[in-house]
Amino acid sequence: MEQVPVLAEDQRNLNEFSVLHSRKAIQELDIKNLKTQIEDIVDAKNECELLDEDDGDDIPALKVGDAFFQVSLPVLLDQLEQSEESLEKQVDVLRSSMEKDETRIQELKSMLYSKFHDQINLD
């Protein structure tokens, strides 16, 4: 098969593909980390639900930044719930962004493979 010349537009498409592919890999790691944090929060909520308001000294402290604060059990559970919701929203935003990127990645793959056939590997 004859070598197909690479035009400036082809190079821009290859560069865009590379950026999107790298961003997708980073977003996948971010989602994995967020899911781990969500699991930790769910575990903490489950442990807190086993506690009684009378277990004052056994109630874990709430971490805010680098500081820990002793709060009541209902406040702690509320904060954990808010944290879980916030992380879920972050996961949703990342997934939405990944879906858009994946659509564009497939478009670029199709364009580039149609021009370069087996002279290029985008997988």
UniProtKB/Swiss-Prot annotation:
Keyword Metal-binding attributed: no
Alphabetically ordered keywords of this record: Chaperone
Any Pfam family matching the protein: Prefoldin_2
Record's function text: Binds specifically to cytosolic chaperonin (c-CPN) and transfers target proteins to it. Binds to nascent polypeptide chain and promotes folding in an environment in which there are many competing pathways for nonnative proteins.
Entry-linked InterPro entries: PFD_beta-like, PFDN4
Name of the protein in its database record: Probable prefoldin subunit 4
Coiled coil: none
Superkingdom classification of source: Eukaryota
Biological classification of the source: Eukaryota, Fungi, Dikarya, Ascomycota, Taphrinomycotina
PANTHER family assigned: PREFOLDIN SUBUNIT 4 (PTHR21100:SF9)
Family per similarity comment: Belongs to the prefoldin subunit beta family.
Originating species: Schizosaccharomyces pombe (strain 972 / ATCC 24843)
GO cellular-component term (any): prefoldin complex
